Amino acid sequence: MSSAVLADHVERQLDELGWETSHIVGNSLGGWVAFELERRGRARSVTGIAPAGGWTRWSPVKFEVIAKFIAGAPILAVAHILGQRALRLPFSRLLATLPISATPDGVSERELSGIIDDAAHCPAYFQLLVKALVLPGLQELEHTAVPSHVVLCEQDRVVPPSRFSRHFTDSLPAGHRLTVLDGVGHVPMFEAPGRITELITSFIEECCPHVRAS
């Protein structure tokens, strides 16, 4: 399992729909896949929200991210063993939301239950870590040929903007958009769904004025 394999899967889905290109949006690993799909010529525009992959093969920041996910392995094991009962443990909400939201209250009970269920049934977790360890991150960003929007999250503990934005800002062509969202963590759709929706739709409307007109 790798970002390339995930991009292959999305390409097959696009082919099944009969879509040569589309406006592609992704968060975290999904942001990495979004830029990979752009490199393959499948994007009309690309929006990466707290995107992963912002490193070279030997960047210290890459190993920092991998170390964070390895450190989270015990929590993953508890979720796998206990399932929803893991949420009854002391500090479970705090620990479960650290990589996701700025505050523990940023995720609802229903959403947190879904997160625990996903974590308990994710066989690709360690496969992705191994692939990330041996492979470079996003390459050829300087050749990005469509409008691109990088959205960073101020309270992101997984890829903090202060250390993880440089690969994008240095590599993407002039004219790309960079937005920093205040007060949200790595998965801002939980804490600020309205703001994220507005960011996505307004960017697409700018790229394609006829969308707004219709």
Curated annotation (Swiss-Prot):
Pfam families noted in UniProt: Abhydrolase_6
Keyword match Protein biosynthesis: no
Keywords attached to this entry: Hydrolase
EC code: 3.3.2.10
InterPro entries the UniProt entry points to: AB_hydrolase_1 (IPR000073), AB_hydrolase_fold (IPR029058)
Positions of the catalytic residues: S28, D156, H186
Record carries keyword Hydrolase: yes
Annotated catalysed reactions: an epoxide + H2O = an ethanediol
Activation and inhibition: Inhibited by AUDA, a known epoxide hydrolase inhibitor.
Induction cue: Expression is up-regulated during acid stress.
GO MF: hydrolase activity
Disruption phenotype: Knockdown mutant shows increased reactive oxygen species (ROS) generation in acidic stress and nutrient depleted conditions.
Chain segments annotated as coiled-coil in the UniProt record: none
PANTHER family, A to Z: ALPHA_BETA-HYDROLASES SUPERFAMILY PROTEIN, HYDROLASE
Function per UniProt: Catalyzes the hydrolysis of epoxide-containing substrates. In vitro, catalyzes the hydrolysis of the synthetic compounds PHOME and styrene oxide. Plays an essential role in subverting phagosomal acidification. Plays a major role in the survival of M.tuberculosis (Mtb) during in vitro acidic stress and protects Mtb in response to phagosomal acidification inside macrophages. Also supports Mtb growth under the nutrient-deprived condition at pH 7.0.
Family: Belongs to the AB hydrolase superfamily.
Protein name (Swiss-Prot/TrEMBL): Epoxide hydrolase EphH
Organism of provenance: Mycobacterium tuberculosis (strain ATCC 25618 / H37Rv)
Biological classification of the source: Bacteria, Bacillati, Actinomycetota, Actinomycetes, Mycobacteriales
